[in-house]
Amino acid sequence: MPNIKSAIKRVKTADTRNSRNASQRSAMRTAIKKFDEAAANNADNAKDLYVEASKKLDSAVSKGLIHKNNAARNKSRLAAKLAK
């Protein structure tokens, strides 16, 4: 544990951000998994789940969780699965 006051605060804020980022990342991954499952089963709600997953990916980019090219690649792959 750090002794300097500013370092103590940095540890606290890092923990807060880490937990927030982890929940965002988890929600993004869950949305992608739900879409993959629906697309594999040719479910009726696959289009809605695709839109939801795309929103989660865009949100992750705006929050700095993933790179914009990573999101674009994932969205492209999801769209290809939806088209099949």
Curated annotation (Swiss-Prot):
<dbReference type="InterPro" id="IPR002583">
    <property type="entry name" value="Ribosomal_bS20"/>
</dbReference>
<protein>
    <recommendedName>
        <fullName>Small ribosomal subunit protein bS20</fullName>
    </recommendedName>
</protein>
<dbReference type="GO" id="GO:0070181">
    <property type="term" value="F:small ribosomal subunit rRNA binding"/>
</dbReference>
<dbReference type="Pfam" id="PF01649">
    <property type="entry name" value="Ribosomal_S20p"/>
</dbReference>
<dbReference type="GO" id="GO:0005829">
    <property type="term" value="C:cytosol"/>
</dbReference>
<dbReference type="GO" id="GO:0015935">
    <property type="term" value="C:small ribosomal subunit"/>
</dbReference>
<feature type="region of interest" description="Disordered">
    <location>
        <begin position="1"/>
        <end position="28"/>
    </location>
</feature>
<comment type="similarity">
    <text>Belongs to the bacterial ribosomal protein bS20 family.</text>
</comment>
<comment type="function">
    <text>Binds directly to 16S ribosomal RNA.</text>
</comment>
<keyword id="KW-0687">Ribonucleoprotein</keyword>
<dbReference type="GO" id="GO:0006412">
    <property type="term" value="P:translation"/>
</dbReference>
<dbReference type="InterPro" id="IPR036510">
    <property type="entry name" value="Ribosomal_bS20_sf"/>
</dbReference>
<keyword id="KW-0699">rRNA-binding</keyword>
<dbReference type="GO" id="GO:0003735">
    <property type="term" value="F:structural constituent of ribosome"/>
</dbReference>
<keyword id="KW-0689">Ribosomal protein</keyword>
<keyword id="KW-0694">RNA-binding</keyword>
